[in-house]
Amino acid sequence: NLFFYDRLGHTISPFLLLDYAAPYHFEPTTAQQGVGTHPHRGFETVTIAYQGEVTHKDSSGGGGTIKAGDVQWMTAGGGVLHQEFHSPEFAHQGGLFEMVQLWVNLPAHSKMTPAKYQAIEATDIQSIRLDDVGSELRVIAGQYQETIGAATTFSPVNVWDGKIVAGQAHTFYVAEGHTTLLVLLSGELILNDEQTIEAPSLVVLSREQIDFKIQAEQDSKFLVLTGQPLNEPIEGYGPFVMNNKAEIMDAINDFNRGKFGVMDRQFILILITYKKAHNSFRVIDFRYKVLY
């Protein structure tokens, strides 16, 4: 993880987690590679594909294959089961795989919203030229200048996906009071003419800042994530992120009762036995159940 809420907490709100799968070459295979069926509740997952392909399916009926440049924005809301594997075509051919998965928290009043899926193709994402030599910014969510992002969100959030050519510089303007995260995926940048950043890195900017400047020492790939802090309690337990322990208990019980839906003919992980002690939860038994 480049960041995770258990370490940074409200500092990164409304964002929770960012996983970066750096470029890796996969050999051709007939085996399924990825993440099997698992649950989520209380937040959204955003998968950005740079290289390779992922086939996704969830219990709300959403799904599809995301290819290079595409984005999958899934709202887990009140509960969803889903799975993500390399697409059969990519697995058969092999090749470079590179992706980001971002978790975005949902406000308390929206945590039980129905699950939904936004399949955003590369052609649906507007791109802005930052200079005349190839630097650009894709507006996945929110707004940059007059350009509106393709994704809809539950709270004010910007997700900007950028690349900048070595020797070029650009200044970004952000809302005062908002969380601003600069995630450098590859390359090397100088921030505000003074701080050198080497990939992979996360920089959390002050909420009092309204702008920041980056200058590329190398060709660089980065994300700018900004959002209005939720200022609500965060209670997380594995694939569930709620506001208190009682809601986590409800999530576990609802999952065990099948309220997250069904993925036909898949192995479903059941958090069947847990123990409450000293104000914490500890799973003491795992079981698998085959649903047909």
Question: What residue ranges belong to the model's regions?
Answer:
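Jelly-roll (double-stranded beta-helix
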Residues: 1-277, 281-284
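Short, positively charged and aromatic/hydrophobic N-terminal segments
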Residues: 274, 289-292
